[in-house]
């Protein structure tokens, strides 16, 4: 008998569907009804889990941050050297190139939208870039580039976003 993966809780399913919808359509353009329909629940059930759109946004940001940290941790285990770990970063960009070309960077588009809206959660969303920045800087430190590790990390982040459009 095959064991099935555990079904996510309704709350977790809401967060995952909202994450995808926010990426595909934007935070402002995604309604409660859109998310409830994607999850397949009534609006009443939806409101049981989340009272406001900002409540969902906070959970989506936390979800993205956790996914990012999980990815960075996996790269740390996969790559024995900083070069191998940096290649994991590059491979992620290659693997996601079509979505990024079509929809933009998941973190960058959310940060840009929240900045335009002057939303109070824009700083929290920006912290995901900080996760990448610190991780990349650490790889450069391990390569012996201690003095300019952060500058190199920022440069690589900026270049990675611009290279996606080539």
Locations of regions flagged by a protein language model:
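Basic, helix-initiating cap at the start of DNA-binding domains
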Residues: 1-25, 29-41, 54-55
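Amphipathic alpha-helical segments enriched in hydrophobic/aromatic and basic residues
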Residues: 22, 31-32, 42-43, 53-64, ...
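Hydrophobic/aromatic residues within well-ordered alpha-helical segments
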Residues: 53, 60, 64-68, 82, ...
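Hydrophobic alpha-helical connector segments
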Residues: 59, 73-103, 153-156
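Amphipathic alpha-helical segments used for helix-helix packing
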Residues: 84-85, 99-120
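Hydrophobic alpha-helical bundle segments that form small-molecule/ligand-binding pockets
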Residues: 117-119, 129-153
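Conserved small/polar residues in nucleotide/adenosyl-binding loops
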Residues: 164-166
């Amino acid at each position: 008998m095959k064991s099935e993966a555990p079904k996510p809780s309704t709350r977790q399913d809401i967060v995952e569907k909202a994450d995808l919808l926010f990426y595909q359509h934007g935070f402002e353009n995604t309604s409660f009804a859109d998310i409830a329909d994607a999850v397949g629940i009534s609006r009443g059930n939806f409101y049981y889990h989340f009272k406001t759109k900002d409540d969902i946004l906070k959970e989506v940001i936390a979800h993205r941050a956790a996914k990012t940290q999980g990815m960075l941790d996996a790269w740390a285990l996969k790559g024995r050297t900083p070069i191998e770990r940096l290649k994991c970063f590059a491979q992620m960009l290659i693997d996601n190139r079509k979505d990024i070309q079509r929809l933009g960077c998941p973190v960058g588009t959310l940060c840009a939208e929240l900045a335009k809206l002057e939303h109070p959660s824009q700083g929290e969303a920006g912290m995901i870039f900080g996760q990448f920045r610190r991780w990349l800087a650490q790889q450069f430190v391990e390569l012996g580039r201690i003095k300019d590790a952060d500058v190199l990390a920022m440069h690589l982040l900026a270049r990675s976003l611009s290279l996606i459009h080539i």
